[in-house]
């Protein structure tokens, strides 16, 4: 063999060995090692104002006011720049709808508290005009005489006249009308608004509750306002349409196609129509003279809660939407939006190769979705405040209920068969499947607990945590937990030792009166490289933290 041939064979052998080693490396993936430290959190999806935006009103000073139910706050929005600030903080500021009187009076509905609050002006004290009326939703003043009317929707179905002096109890105007949402009192003293469950807009006489149908061509009408020109402007949350209905003949004309999940509207003195969108934390300004729409403010997410990672994407239970986020670019894709789909306010999400599960403690539901078609396979009601779920390979689904402290396995036709896997969990919030086949559950009482799925036995991994919520396992076996009462993420090893990953985080949205302490669970996910993602319920962002080695 000559020298040149030797060099040739040496090079060939080297290339072959290199290829073999490369192949072995790709076939035998070595999990990343535990990092020395972590990067600072970086924004993957940008923050936004509100926590879902609902009621709108223009007050006597020309201010655009916007209400948030989940955020328990009433906001002021700059009509030129779109910048927003909290005007009445939580919890008193919770507002599903806002009404402005003929002077400076302001009233708003505390939907989840079943109350109506009122103040005569900015410097006057707040007082409660009504309470113990679940689902107080919409309200408005009769500007001729100062009378105030309010409606119950979803958690009740009635219309009331409220005494602004607080001396008299509420007077029942009508009940079981069909969900009298976002209404307005006309100059004639009649109540004009939509019947959510009947697809109608109607006129109601507050003296006797008599209902007159104006138009029946809507799918899910959410709110209506008069323009003073003989028209009733109506939004349909299911279709996203902004329509004009002529009071004289009931003729409906679709004026603008907006996004679905629109919730309320307000008409300014200059004729501009402002429309809120709960799924986007958005407010649009529509000019009826030109047909132009200007987005005043919006966000990519509404109220991000439960979070799961799969195949390069994050799946987000966004309460008013279900969304997918590209884990690299942060691009957001809508998978479902409230009212335009069969989804019911998702707070938790689970994922497997073939299925996605959504849970809502608010509606007591488990929704099972075919991942290939993104169509609902089964919707199961009747759970006792389900916080999280995991679809299993055998077809069953694991569900945790915060109201019972149970970890359930549901299976069979319609997932009607329930088996208690473990009981006595002290406020189970979120869970993750461990690499050892056990389930790891955060408990609001301050624990990270391992549950053996075979016998239901529980082992405390860590105690003394400050309202732990989201949890995910790293490739090297530890667990990342969101300690929301401390506003930090911690890494917990199997022996219970922990270290802080990041602190002073915008997490831990406080629960209002009567709500479960976790309220909106901070979601945590970890990808195969050990990158951490978490949802921030205080500013509606998603952050990414990268391991430093």
Question: In which residue ranges do the predicted regions lie?
Answer:
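Short loop/turn segments that connect beta-strands within beta-propeller blades
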Residues: 78-82, 119-124, 162-168, 204-209, ...
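Blade-level signature of beta-propeller repeat domains, shared across WD40, Kelch, NHL, RCC1
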Residues: 517-549
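Short loop/turn segments immediately following the C-termini of beta-strands
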Residues: 69, 111-112, 153-154, 196, ...
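Beta-strand-rich domains and repeat architectures in extracellular enzymes and scaffolds
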Residues: 45-73, 536-541
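A short helix->beta-strand "capping" segment at the edge of beta-propeller domains
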Residues: 31-51
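A short beta-strand motif characteristic of beta-propeller blades
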Residues: 40-47, 83-89, 124-130, 168-174, ...
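Beta-rich, blade/repeat-based domains predominating
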Residues: 47-63, 91-110, 132-146, 151, ...
